[in-house]
Amino acid sequence: MHTLVLLRHGQSAWNLENRFTGWTDVDLSPEGEQEARDAARLLTDEGLTFDVCHTSVLTRAIRTLYIVQHEMGLSWLPVHKHWRLNERHYGGLQGLDKAETAARFGEEQVFEWRRSYDTPPPPLPADDPRSPAGDARYAGLAPDVLPASESLKETVARVLPYWHDVIAPQVLAGQRVLVAAHGNSLRALVMHLDGMTPEAVTKLNIPTGLPLVYTLDGTLRPLAHRYLGDPAVAEAKAKAVAAQGAARK
């Protein structure tokens, strides 16, 4: 049997402000930092430890991982950062208030952009200052690789090569792996691991700061998976994620 832990970053400054974030690089909020410390405690209480860690190239996921490592006394572990684990790119929605966007375009349209499987938000123009093209962390990538917007389907297609090429071989080799990433990049992994349909994954909400522990067999099929901590907390956090696209009443 193999162990894999998936962890969505703690609350970010823009989660707190209910803004579309995507590839925008924002930091954790104070609550997000505490969520990372709490995640470390849950992992320690469960008796879990790790051999290798993976995260995106975005600060909120990196800092979540570093806080967890520090709290667990595992700061020495190797960390692999990769853009393929980034959050879904929200295109022209990035930076906008989710509730105000719902009031402007309608909740149904915003739900389609946020939660559908194959509908991307409006793309960013190439010369938009929010474009990743001028960001040094993506300097080695061909311009046509960088997204201007992504559907969840496109996010899955971006994430899975990293799973197949890097993470899965480590898990199969017996390494205990922690992946600290984002709501949609983790939805992509969960969809693959659990064999979820596109319709099912649109209803999946990943709560912030709660470790999701998978026990996998020798072919990486899930034998069990669960969030650590109080199930009621996980359910409440997942419902809060689902409600983010609603207009203010």
Curated annotation (Swiss-Prot):
Family statement: Belongs to the phosphoglycerate mutase family. BPG-dependent PGAM subfamily.
SUPFAM superfamilies found in the cross-reference section: Phosphoglycerate mutase-like
Alphabetical list of InterPro entries matching this protein: His_Pase_superF_clade-1, His_PPase_superfam, PG/BPGM_mutase_AS, Phosphogly_mut1
EC number(s) given by UniProt: 5.4.2.11
Catalysed reaction, written as an equation: (2R)-2-phosphoglycerate = (2R)-3-phosphoglycerate
Gene Ontology molecular function: phosphoglycerate mutase activity
Cited SMART domains: PGAM
Annotated source species: Nitratidesulfovibrio vulgaris (strain DSM 19637 / Miyazaki F) (Desulfovibrio vulgaris)
GO biological process, alphabetically ordered: gluconeogenesis; glycolytic process
Binding-site residues for substrate, renumbered to this chain: 8-15, 21-22, 60, 87-90, 98, 114-115, 183-184
Name this polypeptide is given: 2,3-bisphosphoglycerate-dependent phosphoglycerate mutase
Purpose: Catalyzes the interconversion of 2-phosphoglycerate and 3-phosphoglycerate.
Record keyword Isomerase present: yes
Region (Disordered): 115-137
Catalytic-site annotation from UniProt: H9, E87
Disulfide bonds: none
PANTHER family: PHOSPHOGLYCERATE MUTASE (PTHR11931)
UniProt pathway: Carbohydrate degradation; glycolysis; pyruvate from D-glyceraldehyde 3-phosphate: step 3/5
Complexes and interactors: Homodimer.
Site feature (Transition state stabilizer) residues: H182
